[in-house]
């Protein structure tokens, strides 16, 4: 079991390091892999608050979705453009977040939220990577 956890941790570290260099690249073939499932979700952005629901200070690279707290969210545009990998460590009070049909991405300020919404047009494809627990 310990080996599986170590391998999983290595995979997560690799994904996070790749996300910094691969942002904006297109991978439409990723949607063709039958072993990987994606959810098409509404996507919003927020820039308020200081501490997440899990006690983590807010920072770019986190997102909120009540059903997936503790998981990683790999976000793509519908054309396969890679947006990044986000740690889901926050929740929200909106019905969409509670039902898990929205992913809310933290941005450092209002201008970054507006940029995010223009980029995504309010829709993303999400691959969830289960976290521990």
Please name every model-derived segment.
Residues 18-21:
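Sec/Tat signal peptide C-region and signal peptidase I cleavage site
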Residues 6-9, 32:
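Generic short amphipathic/hydrophobic targeting helices enriched at N-termini
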Residues 23-133:
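Solvent-exposed, well-ordered loop and adjacent helix/strand elements within mature globular domains
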Residues 1-4:
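Positively charged n-region of N-terminal signal peptides that target proteins for export
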Residues 8-16:
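Bacterial N-terminal signal peptides
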């Amino acid at each position: 079991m310990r080996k599986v956890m170590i391998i999983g941790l290595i995979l997560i570290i690799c994904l996070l390091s790749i996300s910094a260099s691969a942002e904006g690249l297109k991978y439409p073939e990723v949607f063709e892999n039958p072993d990987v499932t994606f959810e098409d979700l509404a996507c919003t952005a927020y820039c308020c608050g200081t501490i997440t629901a899990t006690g983590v200070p807010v920072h770019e690279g986190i997102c909120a979705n009540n059903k997936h707290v503790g998981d990683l969210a790999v976000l793509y545009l519908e054309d396969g453009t890679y947006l990044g990998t986000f740690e889901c460590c926050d929740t929200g009070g909106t019905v969409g977040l509670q039902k898990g049909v929205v992913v809310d991405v933290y941005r450092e300020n209002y201008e970054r939220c507006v940029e995010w919404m223009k980029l995504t047009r309010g829709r993303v494809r999400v691959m969830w990577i289960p976290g521990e627990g």
